[in-house]
Swiss-Prot record:
PANTHER family: FORMATE HYDROGENLYASE SUBUNIT 4, FORMATE HYDROGENLYASE SUBUNIT 4-RELATED. Pfam families: NADHdh. GO terms for molecular function: NADH dehydrogenase (ubiquinone) activity. This is Putative NADH-ubiquinone oxidoreductase MJ0520. Belongs to the complex I subunit 1 family. It is an enzyme of class 7 (translocase).
Length: 295
């Protein structure tokens, strides 16, 4: 019982840490993008303030909403990323499980859009199906990592890098493909077709109040998890074993992502899909090469 209580407290602490760090990094991302565009921008704590603002607002339901699904998708969203957080960082389990959980995010995006009854939400939900092309390179990346490290467990990948060095320079194409995933998940991404400005907030347009706060919390945790995964898988234990170094690298990566997103226009849905499928093709070529040469 004591061990279970300790594990529960540890999971709660990890969740709070991930939310706070993810929120501040998203706030930094927004601040840098504003400076790039010649604006002073909001304070770095703006994402936290937005979350708190939605949290205290009254819950109302659009008259066109399908209430059971409308509520369920928000709860599913945070459940998905809490599971990813615990499985990745606490258990250091399989990358395949993490990617499987990540793919479930498309159900949330599609469900959010369709459940509200809003035309903007519906378009965002439909676009989420197109954006599933971003997941194709992920499976190829995992295949390439397995051929190199002979494991898909995060703990084994970290152990491999302790002996053989970082995978960042051994697998640059795979690292680039994963980086594109980070770009697609960051705010105002050129690949952000599901929440493009032309459809207001996309699938999130009609979610506000407590449900909106839940989605904001989930997005902050998601951003933290994906940054952590990139650092763990491609940079290795030299950084990931130090919380200070991990945070520093997350800040650097957020700055890079902000510059990429701030200087790149939003792609049309078909251009976004074509580009990400091209990246998937490059990773598949890398996988075939590793199969031929033996890892």
């Amino acid at each position: 019982m004591m061990l279970m209580d300790t594990s529960l407290i540890g999971a709660i602490n990890l969740t709070i840490h991930a939310f706070l760090v993810g929120s501040l990094l998203l706030g930094l991302h927004r601040k840098i993008m504003a400076r790039i565009q010649g604006r002073p921008g909001p304070p770095i704590i703006q994402y936290l303030l937005h979350t708190l603002k939605f949290y205290v607002k009254e819950i109302t339901f659009p008259i066109t909403a399908g209430n059971p699904l409308y509520i369920f998708v928000a709860l599913l969203d945070i459940a998905i990323w809490l599971a990813a957080l615990i499985i990745a960082i606490d258990f250091k389990s399989s990358l395949l499980i993490i990617i499987g959980i990540y793919v479930l995010q498309k159900i949330v995006e599609h469900g959010c859009g369709l459940s509200s009854g809003s035309p903007y939400g519906k378009i965002g939900g439909v676009r989420s199906v197109f954006s599933a092309a971003a997941e194709v390179p992920l499976f190829a990346v995992v295949a390439a990592i397995y051929l190199t490290t002979h494991s898909v467990l995060i703990s084994d990948i970290l152990s491999y890098q302790e002996i053989h060095g970082s995978l960042l320079f051994k697998m640059p194409i795979c690292a680039f493909a994963f980086f594109i995933l980070l770009v697609s998940k960051a705010p105002n991404s050129p690949f952000g077709i599901v929440k493009g400005k032309d459809i207001v907030s996309g699938y999130m347009t009609e979610h506000y109040g407590l449900l909106g706060a839940i989605i904001y919390i989930a997005e902050a945790i998601a951003y933290f998890v994906l940054l952590w995964l990139f650092i763990a898988v491609f940079i290795g234990p030299l950084v990931i074993n130090s919380p200070v170094l991990t945070l520093a690298v997350m800040v650097v990566m957020t700055v890079i992502l902000a510059f990429v997103n701030g200087l790149t226009p939003l792609l049309a849905p078909h251009h976004s899909v074509m580009l990400q499928m091209t990246i998937a093709g490059l990773v598949l070529c890398d996988v075939l090469y590793r199969l031929i040469v033996g890892g």
